[in-house]
Amino acid sequence: FFHGCAGQYFEVETSIHSVLVLEHLGYEVLVPKHGCCGLALQSNGLYDDARKYVSKLTRDLRSVNQDAPIISASGSCGGMLRHEAHEILEMDTVELRDVGSRTWDICEFLLHLYDQGELDTDFQRIDVTIPYHAPCQLKSQGMGKPAIELMSLIPGVTVKDSEQPCC
C-alpha cells in the first residue's frame, strides 16, 4: 500500500480504512517505508529535486514486492507515479515504468475486482444519499468515476455526483 504524503498526513483515516478493506478481502497488505513522491516540488518548478524523490520512491516501493499491485488512496500521489513523472518530469526509467504500471487507485482496484467477479458484494443495506465530487487528480488520469460505481453497488445508497469540473 502506498499512502503518500496525503495519506500519511492529511487523509490518514482514508489510508487506514483502505488497508482495512484490502485486509478484509484477504490481501496481505505490505506498507514499505517510503517518502514523498515529489509532487509538491514539481508543482513549484523544482524538477531536479522532484526527480530525485520519484527515483527514491520507486526504489522503496519495489523493495518489498516486484509483482504485487501497488494500491493508493491518494489520487495526487498515485497520479505522480502513473503519469506526471513521465509527462511533466520526462522521466523514463525501468523502475518508474514498473511501479507506474502496477499503481492503482483504491476505488479503481476494487472496481476491477468487481468486474473480475472477485469482490464480495454481500453488502448490508443502508438508505443514504451521498454527495460525491470526483477529485481532479483522478479525472486527469482518465479512470472515470470508480468510487460512484462502487458506492452504487451498496443496496440503498444513492450517489449524487456534483458534476463540477473542479472543487
What kind of feature is each model-predicted range?
Residues 2-167:
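Iron-sulfur cluster-binding electron-transfer modules in prokaryotic oxidoreductases
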